[in-house]
Amino acid sequence: MADKHKIIRDSIHGDIKLEGLFLDLLETPEIQRLYNIKQLGLAHLVFPGAHHTRLEHSLGTYHMASQAVEQLNLDNHERQMVSCAALLHDIGHGPFSHTLESILRNLLDVDHVDLTEKLIFGKYEIFDAIEKEIIKSPSVDEILDNHSIDKKKITEIIRGKTHDKPYLSQLLNSAIDVDQLDYLIRDAYYTGVAYGMIDVERFLQTLTINENNLMIKRKGVGVVENILMARGLMYSSVYFHKTVRIAELMLSKALEITPDVDPFQFFKMTDAELINELKTMGPFQHEIATRLKYRKLFKQAYWASSSNLDEARLTVVKNLENKKHHREKEREIENALNIPAGRVIIDVPYQEIHQAEPRIDQTDIMIVDKEEIKSLDDYTPIAGAIRSRAVPDWIIMIVTDERFRDDVSKKAEKILFS
């Protein structure tokens, strides 16, 4: 009898084949839930095609990881570990992907990677008792046990902490890895921007392992430059598009000011479930859900880049990274201008960006040139330019309900920096 397998037709990579362990994992509720979580959160409000899901990205990352381990001629055990980590690396994402992660981090000091690890070890469930009774499917941790998979090694690869063999985790978590490659190409395709044209085949051909680390052959410098440029442009043009950011801030604020919110509970939800739940949480939360449904977003009332501010004001902005102080300043502006709670939102994005995606300005890529190992900086100025480029353009932004925009525009700066 032929081996049981499934072929999934992917918009980016074509046919993706899953069998054995990977087919079993695909059928778990943790993976299937990702069908209902958009890869780019609320970006579809600006880029109407951006309705692709975390599941598509997880499959794409698995596919590229499988290609990479084959090209590198890793042994069967290593291939299985890397491919498994690639398929599972995003199962801990909550609704709207990264949009709400700062709330989870602020309330519980955990992120989606921590939740991914909990799911892998069976310490956290994403379904309730009724759902569990209906679906009756093995969970990720049960499938891993059935196949005698080393869960600790899987989580080390996902976290980038395989210290004995760094190249294993570097395939999934480094300055350039298959996770980033898939989401850059996929997100560019679905948003319609022209920044994700990356020669994947060429990139894979230039991968090599040297001194137990993943490196790039000299002939791959050009494609690495292309990837770094695509990453920078995607962050400024898509991931931190101002209007997308405003929508994300509104959703986060609706949950942030909900009394007695249980972040673990809402992180189990899908996108649609969360929006429906918002409508039951109170008048403000219902309003935000309705505004997001009909794209009636708050407006920018104040904006500044780092070059617009002197040292004293930069210090004020830096202090706003403290969440308690941040909320107090929002309330101060609302009280001074007689604005209802929740309708003034201050965005200080730098810290949040680097917590959500610490690789954003990583360029520590080593190049193998004949018998020498050199830094990417030795071959191109692009690496330095990426590190020095600010993403997004603003260091601080204040958004508000359009009814209060003029008042906030006129007076917020004085209140903020007084």
State the predicted function of each range.
Residues 1-81, 91-418:
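Histidine-centered, transition-metal-coordinating active-site segments
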